[in-house]
Amino acid sequence: MLCRLPGPSTSRGEKEMGNSMKSTPAPLERPLSNTEGLESDFLAVLNDYPSPDISPPIFRRGEKLRVISDEGGWWKAISLSTGRESYIPGICVARVYHGWLFEGLGRDKAEELLQLPDTKIGSFMIRESETKKGFYSLSVRHRQVKHYRIFRLPNNWYYISPRLTFQCLEDLVTHYSEVADGLCCVLTTPCLAQNTPAPTAQPSPCTSPGSPVTLRQKTFDWKRVSSLQEGPEGAENPLRVDESLFSYGLRESIASYLSLTGDDSSNFDRKKKSLSLIYSGSKRKSSFFSAPNTLKINALAGTQKTKALTAT
């Protein structure tokens, strides 16, 4: 929480003067005093590093880095988007708390981050004011970047408009995320939120990582190729399937295979037809030559019958 912590108790070193007690002015309370021991969510890269004039950048503006270690003025960090790990100077990054509270950047850098590609209308950040230490500014992406000063009352409550005060910055963000209430637009997403990588889906145990998604159709019956080849329509698409599911090379291979098997099947059909003709011809021939023999037998039987009648 960023709500104000209880104020410090009266110091014992205060100097007593007469009946009045004069206390040394307490240092201006920072609303983020409870973040000093809090680990930041991430580091936001403010400039390409190294400079493109020196070498290809390892980290680019707008990237989000996860801190590995603090090396005293340098950070050892890893990019949340590319996974690259390297050192980067502290002046090239800003520490980010709660996703929207930026430390270590000014007005110009805030505008650069909010104007990055894919930044949505309503993206915002809260940053420390450059002109008044201990005060903060709200920067919002609209048609152009708008800046609103966040004032603080003596009781350490915060406000943008005096008619509406908040006990902490989180309450302020929550309110203006629901209604614009005088701002250029409603606060939608924290700055750089669109650069957060989406969680990677765990691969199924039945599929190897990186295996392509395949579409499975009904098993093709190669015995039906001859029947599918009949007719001009079957010759063009013998498989009768959606050609978009097959690559051009695969379709060419299938066409070549079908042309080869088509020649073999046609030869087989011709041989089969020839055999059937020979068989039918021989059958006709045997029936043709059997007719005279039948006549001879019938004639012989008639002669014998005639002789028998004559004898009687």
Swiss-Prot record:
Gene3D superfamilies for this protein: SH2 domain (3.30.505.10), SH3 Domains (2.30.30.40)
Q: Give the taxonomic lineage as stored in the record.
A: Eukaryota, Metazoa, Chordata, Craniata, Vertebrata
Instruction: Write out the entry's keywords from A to Z.
Output: Cytoplasm, Endosome, Phosphoprotein, SH2 domain, SH3 domain
Which residues are modified to Phosphoserine? S274
Q: Which InterPro entries match?
A: Grb2-like, SH2, SH2_dom_sf, SH3-like_dom_sf, SH3_domain, SLAP_SH2, SLAP_SH3
**Quaternary structure, from the entry:** Homodimer. Interacts with phosphorylated CBL, SYK and LAT. Homodimerization and interaction with phosphorylated CBL occurs via its C-terminal domain. Interacts with PDGFRB and EPHA2. Interacts with phosphorylated proteins ZAP70; CD3Z; VAV1 and LCP2 via its SH2 domain.
Q: What GO CC terms are in its UniProt record?
A: COP9 signalosome; cytoplasm; endosome; nucleoplasm; plasma membrane
Q: Which gene encodes it?
A: Sla
Region (SLA C-terminal), start-end ranges: 206-312
Organism's domain of life? Answer: Eukaryota
Could you state one GO biological process linked to this protein? regulation of MAPK cascade
Span list, region Disordered: 1-33
Modifications the protein undergoes after translation, according to the UniProt entry: Phosphorylated.
Question: What does the protein in this record do?
Answer: Adapter protein, which negatively regulates T-cell receptor (TCR) signaling. Inhibits T-cell antigen-receptor induced activation of nuclear factor of activated T-cells. Involved in the negative regulation of positive selection and mitosis of T-cells. May act by linking signaling proteins such as ZAP70 with CBL, leading to a CBL dependent degradation of signaling proteins.
- Name this protein carries in UniProt: Src-like-adapter
